[in-house]
Amino acid sequence: MNQFKKDFYKKISFEKDIIHNKNILSNKIYNQNILVIGGAGTIGSSYIKQILKYKPSKITVVDINENGLTELTRDLRSSNLLDYNPEYITYPVNLLSDTFDKIFNSELWQVVSNFSAHKHVRSEKDKISVEALIKNNVFGAIKLLNLCELNPPKYFFSVSTDKAANPVNIMGASKSLMEKLILSKKNKFRVSTARFANVAFSNGSLLDGFIYRLNKKQPLSCPSDIKRFFVTPEQSGQICLLATFLGETGNIFFPKLDFDKDQIYFKEIALDFLKENGFEPELVLSEQEAKKFDFGKCPTKYPIYFFQTDTSGEKNI
């Protein structure tokens, strides 16, 4: 499984920008007080790992996922990233709560980075879900920007998505509005954001789901007509790091990717995934057929169902 990830990541690797800007990043991050909201997720935790390399004096991580914060702490302590003994604090708190206000107003922050977001199109499946999405992506941003306006940080960053460009769904539209709200503050304090595509094997992603399905001996399914740009979890943190500290206020950062060469079909990844794990893909015609597959009779084969997308909420690239 890990080897498959390594081989997959080789296809989408980039490191030059971090190396080229190493001294600039060090000068801007060293000995700073940093607040990260939504830091227990895939992108937020990767960002924290990147930023700790430049030795801030203090880093405070806020996330509603208490288990995620626990795992982040274990991960950081098991590495050498906290060996220089920075002040490191975590709070299992919602950005929209009064408790968060107390945390924010308790001290001055040089860097405020926000990764708290609803990121999936499926988050708009009903009215309640849409309400939660808008509260998080839009009203959460408004609240955070208003707090920052009272006590401006040196750097404010909030992650966006490629779906914010010409949005075709509510999630993308909410992030597009979030971007506009952020840019409206560009003359009051330094603000930036970053758009990028799918983070490969991130929590809750389709590729991450492949691993769960395989471990549970459940069929795989994925769209046959959708291809995407991918970045690795590490690269997602690097992009956000660069966007936070480089460029001008009001900039929207995104990776330079080749439209023709760098997109990958989910179908191709699924087939490679099964082959790398020692299985021969067994193509089935329906979800029902996939569920009836007898793993005992065919131990070297694995059922996979490909379907054509039929929702206007998803872009085809």
Regions found by a protein language model. Give the residues of each.
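Non-catalytic terminal and boundary segments that flank Rossmann-like NAD(P)-dependent oxidoreductase
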Residues: 1-33
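N-terminal Rossmann NAD(P)H-binding glycine-rich loop of SDR-like oxidoreductase domains
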Residues: 34-54
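NAD(P)H-binding glycine-rich loop region in Rossmannoid oxidoreductase-like domains
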Residues: 50-61, 77, 84, 93-134
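Helix N-cap at the beta1-alpha1 junction of Rossmann-like dinucleotide-binding domains, i.e.
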Residues: 63-68
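Conserved Rossmann-fold NAD(P)-dependent oxidoreductase catalytic core, especially the SDR/UDP-sugar
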Residues: 114, 118-123, 127-135, 139-176, ...
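Mid/C-terminal beta-alpha module of Rossmann-like enzyme folds, strongest
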Residues: 246-317
